[in-house]
């Protein structure tokens, strides 16, 4: 070989791809088998086992609630009924009450035309250092102007009064600006709710609330959304274009898939798990999302799912109750993933290999979010919320103090449902027995070929003489007594008790058999108002436990990540579900009465155009009319007032805004001095003035 020549090794594309895969596999193995990841997985398994065992009694209650709504007996009770024989009828009282409660809550919270929440300014907006300096500058300008006009310095009392006047005027303008920001923030959140599936999730949440010991909703959670966009092609035609964007979404969490830490009362008190049954499409959608391990997801898609975290027996029973039959034969592969939200001690994180920069204080607890699927950790990050809040909100139809799980309607009226079922079964059995006679046949007097198992009209009975010479009939008929009236009385009594125990009276969903005051329209209105007290407590639970925290989290999300600075400000979330519970027709009448009563010059001077416009907006919204198209916005009104106010709004006293000095007058009001002072008039005493 000649000197100075070198040999280059040529590597094929397949070889390069193989080397890249091997390098990626080594990096994935090192990452997944690191001391930190192994420690996290071990800790999560211990927490999961405790939460799964503690959830078992609640799962039994929820399965019983599903059967109760579906009109099915418990397996042991159904076996006893079949052993005894007779009717297996099931009266659907629970289903009727649950549907009525759902309809009532949806009418209050979803069908009012306005969202059950509002964004308002705080009573006293916080002043930033820059705004404080603006107030000081305005006060200095006032002092300088007074020195120019009055040629004297202000006293201490005048300084304090002037400073307070400047601050009040500034705060008033600040409140107006904050209200404009609040309106824009409200529109922004309403748009995010519409695109993020809030209405659908909240609708399912209400069904869970009426049925199970707790209902849970999740959000905002940042996910990839596939939307349809429109653009012009080369020929100028409008064509569809699929778009992918990252945006907040909301979802109803199945109570069967939520596992809280044993012994906690609220979600914020401890850790929790959510079980995710993921299809391949749902799992692949996580690729490219912030915080997820793309290589682990791709490896999982290649290998398939081999670990089941949940109780398969409970899963199959639940799916059958939901009329999802033979799901084990489903060809689509389902991956069982667990999502963990909770605290991990800094000491454990240090022991698992995290540095002092990542974990400054080992004595503190750090909020973490971890996804585990199969043998892989898909995501392990610290909680992105500045206060460590978890993206869940839950409440119950009836809350039990100190307990995480409350009670749903099926659990509340379970005993009543059982009594009504027993009365209905006895009634049906008694009706069957008493529907015809009991037949007694003397076999000694019946020919051998006579069929005594059938009875029908006009049947001819062949009999022989009684060998003993008795005159008794060979065939005797006995009519059993009917107890239908007594059994119906028992059923009616206990079905009325279901109204009282559930707080959902029958006349709310169209029962016309109302006695007493309910026979008149005003009396029925009073009864419905009284019945509203029971549901008001449930609505207050939804307001405080679900609507306010969810909307507040969306507000914080927009404050942190939205680029539009015009929506940001010192604002607060006000839930309005309990307010919507009031009779809307009565409220609309009262609003219109107030609108007419305030249509006079005195009230107009007090309210001003802004106040009148605010009143018109509320009336238009309550009538489900387009308020923004009927009443101009605050900015439009302000521009119109400035445009028309020009000279009319100039300060009195001529140019410069100087106040004209008052003209000296006599005690009777006439002017002193000048041309008017030279006019002689007669005063009240008859003398000249």
Named regions from a protein language model:
Residues 1-367, 486, 492-493, 686-688:
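Extended, helix-rich architectural segments
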Residues 171-175, 179, 192, 196, ...:
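Short, charged/polar micro-motifs that form catalytic or ligand-binding hotspots
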Residues 188, 192-195, 220, 416-430, ...:
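Generic, well-ordered alpha-helical scaffold segments in large soluble proteins
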Residues 220-221, 228, 232, 519-618:
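Extended amphipathic alpha-helical segments with heptad-repeat/coiled-coil character used for oligomerization
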Residues 660-689:
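Long, low-complexity, intrinsically disordered segments
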Residues 608-653:
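Long, highly charged low-complexity segments enriched in Glu/Asp and Lys/Arg with interspersed Ser/Thr
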Residues 338-518:
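Extended, charged amphipathic alpha-helical segments
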Residues 200-208, 219-222, 431-443, 508-515, ...:
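Short coil/turn segments at secondary-structure boundaries
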């Amino acid at each position: 070989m000649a000197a100075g020549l070198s040999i280059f090794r040529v590597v094929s594309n397949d070889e390069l791809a193989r080397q890249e895969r091997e390098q990626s596999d080594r990096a994935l193995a090192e990452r997944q088998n690191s001391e930190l990841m192994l420690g996290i997985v071990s800790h999560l398994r211990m927490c999961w086992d405790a939460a799964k065992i503690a959830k078992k009694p609640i799962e039994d209650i929820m399965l019983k609630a599903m059967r109760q709504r579906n009109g099915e007996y418990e397996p042991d009770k159904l076996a006893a009924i079949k052993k005894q024989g007779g009717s297996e009828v099931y009266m659907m009282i629970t289903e009727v009450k649950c549907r009525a409660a759902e309809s009532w809550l949806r009418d209050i919270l979803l069908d009012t035309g306005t969202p059950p929440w509002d964004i308002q300014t705080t009573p006293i907006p916080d002043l930033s250092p820059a705004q404080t300096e603006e107030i000081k500058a305005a006060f200095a300008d006032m002092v300088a102007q007074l020195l120019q006009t009055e040629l004297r310095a202000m006293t201490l009392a005048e300084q304090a009064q002037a400073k307070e006047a400047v601050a009040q005027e500034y705060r008033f303008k600040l409140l107006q600006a904050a209200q404009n920001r609040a309106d824009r923030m409200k529109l922004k959140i309403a748009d995010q709710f519409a695109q993020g599936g809030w209405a659908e999730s909240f609708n399912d949440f209400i069904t869970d609330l009426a049925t199970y010991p707790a209902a849970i909703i999740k959000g905002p959670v940042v996910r990839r959304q596939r939307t349809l966009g429109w653009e012009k092609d080369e020929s100028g035609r409008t064509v569809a274009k699929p778009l992918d964007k990252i945006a907040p979404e909301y979802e109803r969490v199945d109570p069967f898939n939520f596992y809280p830490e044993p012994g906690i009362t609220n979600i914020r008190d401890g850790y929790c798990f959510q079980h995710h049954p993921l299809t391949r499409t749902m799992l692949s959608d996580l690729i490219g999302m912030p915080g997820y391990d793309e290589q682990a997801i791709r490896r999982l898609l290649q290998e398939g799912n081999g670990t089941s975290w949940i109780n398969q027996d409970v899963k199959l029973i639940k799916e059958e109750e939901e009329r999802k039959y033979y799901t084990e034969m489903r060809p689509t592969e389902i991956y069982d993933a667990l999502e963990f939200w909770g605290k991990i001690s800094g000491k454990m994180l240090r022991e698992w290999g995290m540095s002092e920069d990542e974990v400054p204080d080992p004595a503190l607890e750090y909020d973490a979010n971890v996804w585990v699927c199969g043998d892989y950790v898909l995501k392990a990050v610290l909680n992105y919320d500045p206060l460590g809040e978890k993206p869940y909100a839950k409440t119950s139809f009836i809350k039990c103090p100190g307990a995480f799980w409350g009670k749903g309607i099926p659990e509340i009226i379970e005993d009543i449902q059982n009594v009504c079922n027993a009365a209905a079964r006895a009634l049906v059995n008694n009706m069957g027995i008493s529907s015809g006679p009991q037949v007694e046949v003397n076999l000694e007097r019946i020919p051998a070929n006579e069929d005594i198992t059938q009875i029908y009209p006009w049947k001819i009975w062949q009999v022989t003489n009684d060998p003993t010479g008795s005159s008794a009939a060979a065939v005797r008929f006995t009519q059993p007594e009917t107890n239908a009236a007594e059994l119906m009385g028992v059923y009616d009594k206990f079905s009325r008790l279901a109204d009282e125990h559930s707080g959902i009276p029958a006349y709310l969903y169209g029962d016309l058999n109302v006695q007493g005051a309910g026979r008149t329209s005003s009396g029925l209105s009073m009864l419905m108002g009284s019945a509203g007290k029971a549901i008001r407590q449930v609505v207050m639970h939804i307001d405080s436990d679900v609507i306010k925290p969810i909307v507040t989290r969306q507000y914080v999300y927009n404050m942190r990540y939205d680029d539009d600075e015009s929506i940001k400000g010192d604002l607060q979330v006000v839930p309005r579900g309990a307010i919507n519970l009031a009779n809307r027709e009565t409220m609309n009448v009262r609003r219109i009465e107030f609108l007419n009563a305030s249509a006079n010059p005195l009230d107009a001077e007090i309210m001003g155009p802004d106040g009148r416009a605010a009143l018109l907006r509320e009336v238009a919204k309550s009538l489900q009319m387009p308020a923004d198209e009927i009443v101009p916005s605050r900015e439009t009104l302000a521009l119109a007032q400035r445009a028309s106010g020009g000279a009319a709004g100039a300060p009195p006293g001529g140019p410069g805004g100087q106040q004209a000095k008052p003209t000296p007058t006599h005690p009777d009001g006439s002017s002193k001095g000048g041309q008017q002072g030279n006019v002689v008039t007669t005063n009240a005493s008859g003398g000249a003035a």
